[in-house]
Amino acid sequence: MIDRVKILVGLLALIANGGNSFAQPDTDGGGSLTRLEGGGYVDEDTVRTARETLSHSVTLPEWKNPSAFEKDVFTFTRIIFWADPAKQVERGGFGGGGFGGGFGFGRRGWVVDYPDADLNFSHRLQQLTSMKVDPDARVMKLTNPDLFDFPFIYMEHIERMTLRPAEVLALQKYLKAGGVLLVNDFWGALAWKNLRDEISKVLPGRTWTELTMEHPIFHSVFNLQGPMSRLRVPSMQRWNTDYNPNDPNSNPTASYRGEGYETMHVQALLDDKQRIMVLAIHNSDISDGWEREGEYMDYFKLFSEARSYPLGINIIFYLMTH
């Protein structure tokens, strides 16, 4: 059984520092190689941590946990998966436009926002809560034998994700043992269909539950207020700079993301005890708020500080304690 609770002793001691809590930091081909958004490559077969991958956004502080806590820490763990280039994606989606093409990029959606999102979010968890957090974050395949050491795993841009039989079996065992998967940053009807189809191989017979703003996940640490559209985060490259957060009819996303992209949804697959096994944030990109926090102050204030970090912290707290 994966133990979620032992790494969260004292999590509720959230550091209260008013409006300055999220102070913005200073900015400064094929095979197993995959090209990163910011340039450079990562080897899927040998990479172990996000920290070892070249960061392109900000310079992050490093920290060390007390030796007694080195293993009992929360580790943000990103999953490497295969993206089938033959799968249809929405026009303008990842691989269908924008980031299409290139050496190993556009085929493997797992690298989007990596490694900056992973490292920034880990830093904010360490900074803003009393949680002990792994400063390096992990990245691995579902077939990695270390998978069961980490109660939380993360995927994004799953439009073309295709799980192989060994991955299906590993993920099924992981989720049934108490692990939880967060899926984020996928847009439109085709992307949703692909997630539904792939996860149905893992958890056949389970049906998705739509979470409303009344769900405690939205109030576990930060008391987030609805409607759901107030939590929506656009990708920075697609941000509508005329967006008015006080106007419920104002769309933060400036460009078409495929049929069915207009509304943010948060959906979950539950086990027989109503524990969340898979949480999916559809038509929103909270990880861009983590990745891009040091690049543009207006985006940081509107989305990183007000939405991405509060929602992310709420999600981790709730998933690790329920």
What are these regions (language model features)?
Residues 131-141, 183-186, 206-214:
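Surface-exposed patches in mature extracellular/periplasmic domains of secreted proteins
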